[in-house]
């Protein structure tokens, strides 16, 4: 690292089932004269499944253990243990992803010096083999997109803001292949509107969509923090996202919104954007059996600092928030929201980043459930800022 330039190399693995590697470079003063940023990154990941024999043998193992448990406890000694997870690794069921991106950003002088404009050109390739957890199960899918973002930030401190605001408006757009490739995508469907899995796999060889997002946060100290450093701070937020299509017969299952929980679904969110909403299970607010093509989230949070040092920040918080997701843009309703409330704590350490834990209670019923979201604990680790 020199002159603010950053090179990041990371790797993550879960034995043979999941591997992820990435490398990125960021220069905040590209050219050395003006605050123009430049970035380039690449990543690769692979996730595999287990054989269906695992579930069959698990049933077999549990069944016979229940029979013989009264005759010497065979199950206790793991005789014929069919549940050894490693033995069911199936390399023929997998999803691989790799991608490249290059970005550029510029600080604007109008309307004021707090505005920035950035652009990123990205390419991702998905290679799926008998992957049953997504609408596309086999094939190769390509995603080329241009992301434009207009943002403004006037906060006084990135770790514990006490005044100012942040907002961003972004558009992520792919080429409209269906408008010029000459294919009859309606013909991929049966007369009753259904579609075979083979046709579904062919439908998304080249992914197309346009994605729009708006996010805003404000920070207000409830006392003069220059004389009362430990003043309470009120943070308010509002955000929404829409995923549109050029052709109604080619709606993208990629880049959809996965709403609910702590926003830390990890490597399972390979083709979706995770949106946190505390007080509910992960992904529980996305309509069951479909994708989220629209979402909204809003909330207020009251923060109290326990320690504000150069290298360490600790604060506690209480919050009210609400949000929801819809499987069609036309169903978007900012007044149909799932509500929650809770408390939490945040600790920032230089070598780790932000850590925290929240307890939240969801007051409303979710899709496919007759009960309210209920009580949940949520964790914040590293640089993830989905719930902070």
Regions found by a protein language model. Name each.
Residues 1, 129-306, 318-319, 326-328, ...:
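C-terminal outer-membrane beta-barrel translocator/porin domains of Gram-negative envelope proteins
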Residues 1-160, 166, 278-279, 289, ...:
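Gram-negative/organellar outer-membrane beta-barrel architecture
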Residues 31-34, 110-113, 156, 222-224, ...:
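Short coil turns and loop connectors of transmembrane beta-barrels in diderm outer membranes
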Residues 55-59, 253-256, 333:
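Short secondary-structure boundary/capping segments
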Residues 278, 323-340:
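Outer-membrane beta-barrel transmembrane domain signature
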Residues 312-318:
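Generic long, charged, amphipathic alpha-helical segments
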Residues 334-355:
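Strand-loop-strand
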């Amino acid at each position: 690292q020199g002159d603010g330039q950053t090179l990041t190399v990371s790797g993550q693995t879960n034995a043979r089932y999941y591997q992820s590697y990435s490398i990125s470079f960021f220069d905040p003063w590209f050219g050395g004269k003006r605050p123009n940023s430049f970035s380039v990154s690449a990543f690769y990941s692979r996730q595999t499944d287990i054989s269906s024999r695992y579930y069959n043998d698990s049933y077999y193992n549990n069944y016979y253990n229940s029979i013989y448990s009264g005759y010497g406890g065979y199950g206790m000694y793991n005789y014929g243990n069919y549940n050894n997870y490693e033995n069911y690794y199936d390399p023929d069921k997998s999803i691989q992803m790799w991608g490249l991106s290059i970005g550029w950003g510029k600080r604007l002088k109008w309307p004021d010096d707090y505005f920035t404009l950035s652009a990123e050109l990205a390419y991702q390739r998905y290679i799926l083999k008998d992957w049953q957890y997504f609408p596309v199960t086999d094939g190769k899918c390509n995603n080329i997109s241009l992301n434009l973002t207009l943002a403004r930030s006037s906060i006084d401190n990135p770790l514990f803001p006490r005044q100012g605001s942040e907002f961003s408006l972004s558009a992520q757009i792919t080429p409209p292949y269906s408008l010029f490739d000459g294919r009859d995508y309606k013909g991929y469907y049966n007369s009753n509107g259904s579609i075979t899995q083979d046709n579904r796999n062919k439908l998304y060889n080249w992914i197309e969509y346009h994605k729009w997002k708006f996010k805003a946060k404000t920070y207000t100290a409830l006392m003069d923090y220059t004389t009362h450093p430990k003043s309470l701070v009120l943070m308010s937020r509002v955000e929404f996202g829409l995923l549109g299509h050029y052709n109604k017969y080619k709606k993208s299952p990629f880049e959809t919104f996965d709403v609910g929980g702590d926003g830390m679904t990890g490597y399972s969110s390979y083709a979706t954007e995770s949106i946190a909403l505390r007080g509910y299970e992960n992904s529980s607010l996305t309509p069951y059996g479909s994708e989220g093509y629209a979402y909204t989230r809003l909330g207020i949070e009251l923060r109290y600092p326990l320690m504000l040092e150069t290298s360490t920040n600790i604060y506690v918080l209480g919050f009210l928030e609400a949000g929801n997701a819809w499987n069609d843009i036309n169903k978007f309703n900012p007044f149909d929201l799932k509500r929650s409330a809770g408390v939490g704590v945040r600790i920032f350490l230089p070598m780790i980043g932000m850590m925290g834990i929240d307890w939240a209670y969801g007051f409303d019923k979710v899709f496919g459930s007759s009960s309210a979201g209920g009580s949940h604990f949520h964790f914040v680790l590293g640089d993830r800022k989905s719930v902070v």
